[in-house]
Swiss-Prot record:
Protein name per its UniProtKB record: Sensor protein KdpD
EC number(s) recorded for this UniProt protein: 2.7.13.3
Residue span(s) of domain Histidine kinase: 670-883
Enzyme class label: transferase
Cytoplasmic compartment spans: 1-400, 445, 499-894
Superkingdom, natural source: Bacteria
Protein's membrane topology: Multi-pass membrane protein
Gene: kdpD
GO cellular component: cytosol; outer membrane-bounded periplasmic space; plasma membrane
Lineage summary: Bacteria, Pseudomonadati, Pseudomonadota, Gammaproteobacteria, Enterobacterales
GO molecular function: ATP binding; phosphorelay sensor kinase activity; protein homodimerization activity; transferase activity, transferring phosphorus-containing groups
Reactions mediated catalytically: ATP + protein L-histidine = ADP + protein N-phospho-L-histidine
Keywords, comma-separated and alphabetical: ATP-binding, Cell inner membrane, Cell membrane, Kinase, Membrane, Nucleotide-binding, Phosphoprotein, Transferase, Transmembrane, Transmembrane helix, Two-component regulatory system
Subcellular location, record wording: Cell inner membrane
Length: 894
């Protein structure tokens, strides 16, 4: 094969060398619970145990399934570690015992499981990571909804937010992933038969999470995720040394763009084919020594075709190789592209016996070719209007080269005439060939052709008898002339090609040096002005162009950072359009192409940070594909530098905000501590005074009761300040326990009973609804929400608490029929020190709802606010429901 072998990736070889020291991870992957992941894992473990492998069961959840429990027979089970937590004993995986036991393989069910507080790692996947680092192989299971990248997608489909997730990099790093699949109808039948959940849970699951539409969507996500992983494995394997053939595992298209007319038709045909096949496609153009002979019009057509391909979804590249077919085949093999799309001109010149398609088929017969007919014949190079000046400049150089060629031939002839007596005439041919090489080296192909012809004529006139005429006395000299002409043409052509390759190499070295120097200069920039000055300096030196960097001000209006002299004023409307759309405008684009400048957006990722306006001295030089690609790379470097400044500024603001918050919390905590003791004493004295005056029947008993109530309100405010400071500093431990919802609500109502003028409407689910919460903290949430309703809805307003279980979540609403929330403040009302109506006479500092959100967040839930259609406000708390303990265990804990 004519292609050079691909060199192995050193990083990949290092990874392969280090791989055997780490345990292997095998993931049994499924769409949802009940598809048979655990059973498949145990079946594989039983097969390996029969082969003599040392296997230990670390954690396997049978969920009461008899067939799953039966698969555990014969397997060694590692005892779970029981640890005390708030008076209860929780069983968790014993990581230290597993490391001490060091089996060859350990089974770890439910990869996304969250460990109990006090464990070494908060997540089970972190336990597995430590096992792998110790060289122990691991089998585990996970559902698609637990992958971090798909968590939002799944919640959008099912309406249920899954809290336990696994980072995608950990899943992707698994050595093997086994997809365990089950059709939705079969899975629903298993649910009905009680093979997944117990009867009551199964009925609710079928109506909510396990709806057929949900199962189909989850199944598609699991299949796609597995297919993407398999495709990535195939690509990684193809990177191994020696894998050079294209694998036709899926349709992938490579479009070859030439300099013939009709390239845009070719691009559109490739895009249509890729769309029908649902495949990826690439578009490439190969730079050859012939490129420098193309007129600027054709170069712009090549650039336009590459841009069109990129707009239509292709990955574009510009290759460089004297042999086009070798570059195309090498690129196709590197990217596993099995279909090559080529343009077939309408006519074929008689002297071209082998076309590009023929050469491609000869060196790569395994690649499929798709030929697209070009309606127009190959365009000839004509000096028409837009390129007259450029062609004149080129012809001026060519004519100068021809004059130099003639002069050099004359000098060689004079020297050879002096040496004629010492050397044979045939040996003087070498001098003429040397002249051809010199002309080709400095002036290119056509002057070397002229030099070759003049040399042959001069040799005949001055050195072959009869001298002074073109006639020859010996027919053998005709062969000498033919060889001399042929060798001269070949040497001239080869020398011109070498000259072009040297020029290309010099250009690439210069381009690389400019990119390196620019990136180094941008890296030390500390302000947008530094970035703008650096970019304008390098654009001026590289492209011989003036430029301006435009950045948006606080109002979004684009403003220049510098004011270079002599630039054409740019159009504000077009610049704003380019910034808003993130698309280039001006010369060489489809938007305002007649202006003498080009506007390029400074984009990094999906965000546009500004614009750069470039006005070159020679617009044609800027329009050639190589220069355009270099300019686009420059703009990307500038955008990355601006992004770095933005991120640095955001980080600094966040740091300062955090420091301010810490100081404020410390001040509030200190102030609240100083106030708590006198308030406690004052409340006690007010309580005694109220009771004494009431027992005496004093008319001042009412005033004493008001004093007591105001002291109580102030005490609650101080407690809120302390709680917020404690939550923000992280200085509290969440002490969850199993409580009934009725108990928590009743306790909160009892605390507020003196301040409630009317009873609360309650609508709670069936008795003994268990919630896993920190009792005092969650009571504080209900107290704050009810106090908020009493304050803003009025003492005579109707207030209620509704609760119901929806799927895997408990939804609790605290509502009233008061004036409702101010429009647009449904989210900001939960901020610290935020109040719905700042001019309101209702006392308070705006901490109650902020504390509610903080407490709900640490419980893994959410809290939202909205106005009810029938009037009034509603605050909704959503908590994830965990599997409740068995009733007997619950009574023991109670």
């Amino acid at each position: 094969m004519n292609n050079e072998p691909l060199r192995p990736d050193p990083d990949r070889l290092l990874e392969q060398t280090a791989a055997p020291h780490r345990g292997k991870l095998k993931v049994f992957f499924g769409a949802c619970a009940g598809v048979g992941k655990t059973w498949a894992m145990l079946a594989e473990a039983q097969r390996l145990r029969a082969q003599g492998l040392d296997i230990v069961v670390g954690v396997v959840e049978t969920h009461g399934r008899k067939d799953t429990a039966a698969m555990l027979e014969g397997l060694a089970v590692l005892p779970l570690k029981r640890q005390a937590y708030r008076g209860r004993h929780i069983s968790e995986f014993d990581l230290d015992a597993a490391l001490a036991r060091r089996p060859a393989l350990i089974l770890m069910d439910e990869l996304a499981h969250s460990n109990a507080p006090g464990s070494r790692h908060p997540k089970r996947w972190q336990d597995i990571e430590e096992l792998l680092e110790a060289g122990i192989d691991v089998f585990t299971t996970v559902n698609v909804q637990h992958l971090e990248s798909l968590n939002d997608v799944v919640s959008g489909v099912t309406g249920i937010q899954v809290r336990e997730t696994v980072p995608d990099p950990f899943f992707d790093a698994a050595d093997d992933v086994v997809l365990v699949d089950l059709p939705p109808d079969d899975l629903r039948q298993r649910l009905k038969e009680g093979k997944v959940y117990i009867a009551g849970q199964a009925e609710r699951a079928i109506e909510h999470f396990f709806r057929k539409g949900n199962l189909i969507a989850l199944r598609e996500l699991a299949l796609r995720r597995t297919a993407d992983r398999v495709d990535e494995q195939m690509r990684a394997w193809r990177g191994h040394p020696g894998e050079e053939k294209v694998w036709h595992t899926r349709d992938a298209i490579l479009l070859c763009i030439g300099h013939n007319t009709g390239s845009e038709k070719l691009v559109r045909a490739a895009a249509r084919l890729a769309s029908r096949l649902g495949s990826v496609w690439h578009a490439v153009y190969v730079e050859t020594p012939a490129l420098h002979r193309l007129p600027e019009k054709k170069r712009r057509a090549i650039l336009s075709a590459l841009r069109l391909a990129q707009e239509l979804g292709a990955e574009t590249a510009t290759l460089s190789d004297p042999a086009e077919e070798k570059a195309v085949v090498r690129y196709a093999r590197e990217h596993n592209l099995g279909k090559i799309i080529l343009g077939r001109p309408a006519s074929r010149r008689w002297w071209r016996r082998e076309t590009f398609a023929d050469r491609l088929a000869r060196i790569a017969p395994d690649l499929d070719q798709v030929l697209v007919a070009l309606d127009e014949p190959p365009a000839r190079t004509i000096n028409n209007a837009p390129d007259n000046r450029s062609f004149k400049d080129k012809w001026r150089v060519q004519i100068q080269g021809c004059v130099v060629a003639a002069a050099l031939c004359a000098v060689i002839t004079l020297i050879a005439m002096q040496w004629l007596m010492a050397f044979d005439a045939a040996n003087l041919v070498m001098l003429y060939l040397l002249g051809v090489v010199v002309v080709a080296l400095f002036y290119g192909r056509w002057p070397s052709v002229v030099a070759t012809v003049i040399n042959v004529v001069s040799f005949d006139l001055f050195f072959i008898a009869p001298r002074g005429t073109l006639a020859v006395s010996d027919v053998q000299y005709l062969l000498t002339f033919a060889v001399m002409l042929t060798v001269g043409l070949v040497i001239g052509n080869l020398t011109a090609g070498v000259r072009y390759q040297a020029r290309v190499a010099r250009y690439r070295e210069q381009r690389t040096r400019h990119l390196y120097e620019m990136s180094k200069a941008l890296a030390v920039g500390r302000s947008p002005q530094d970035i703008a000055a650096t970019s304008e300096q390098f654009i001026a030196s590289t492209f011989h162009a003036r430029s301006q960097v435009l950045l948006p001000d606080d109002n979004g209006k684009l403003q220049p950072l510098t004011h270079p002299q002599g630039m054409t004023p740019w159009d504000d409307a077009i610049a704003q359009w380019s910034f808003d759309k993130g698309l280039p405008a001006g010369a060489g684009t489809d938007t305002l192409p007649g202006v003498p400048y080009q506007i390029l957006p400074l984009k990094s990722g999906e965000k546009t940070y500004g614009l750069v306006v470039v006005e070159p001295g020679n617009l044609r030089q800027l329009m050639i594909p190589e220069q355009q690609r270099l300019l686009e790379t420059f703009t990307l470097l500038v955008a990355n530098a601006l992004e770095r400044l933005t991120l640095t500024a955001s980080e600094e603001q966040a740091r300062m905000a955090s420091e301010r918050e810490q100081i404020r919390n410390a001040l509030l905590a200190a102030l609240s501590h100083d106030l708590r003791t006198p308030l406690t004493v004052l409340f006690g004295q007010a309580e005694i005074l109220t009771l004494d005056l009431a027992s005496e029947g004093s008319p001042h008993a009412r005033q004493a009761s008001e004093i007591r109530q105001h002291v109580l309100n102030t005490t609650r405010l101080v407690n809120n300040l302390l709680d917020m400071a404690r939550i923000q500093s992280g200085g509290f431990n969440l002490k969850k326990e199993w409580l009934t919802l009725e108990e928590v609500v009743g306790s909160a109502l009892q605390m507020l009973e003196p301040g409630l003028s009317s009873p609360i409407n309650l609508s709670l689910p069936e008795p003994l609804t268990l919630i896993h919460v920190d009792g005092p903290l969650f009571e504080r949430v209900l107290i704050n929400l009810l106090e908020n309703a009493v304050k803003y809805a009025g003492a005579q307003a109707e207030i209620g608490i509704d609760a119901h279980v929806e799927g895997e979540n408990l939804q609790l609403d605290v509502w009233d029929n008061g004036p409702g929330l101010p429009p647009g403040q449904e989210q900001t009302i939960f901020d610290k020190f935020a109040r719905g109506n700042k001019e309101s006479a209702v006392p308070g500092v705006g901490l109650g709802l902020a504390i509610c959100r903080a407490i709900v967040d640490v419980h893994g839930g959410t809290i939202t606010a909205f106005n009810r259609p029938e009037g009034g406000a509603c605050f909704r708390v959503t908590l994830p429901q965990q599997t409740a303990p068995e009733l007997e265990e619950f009574h023991e804990d109670m």
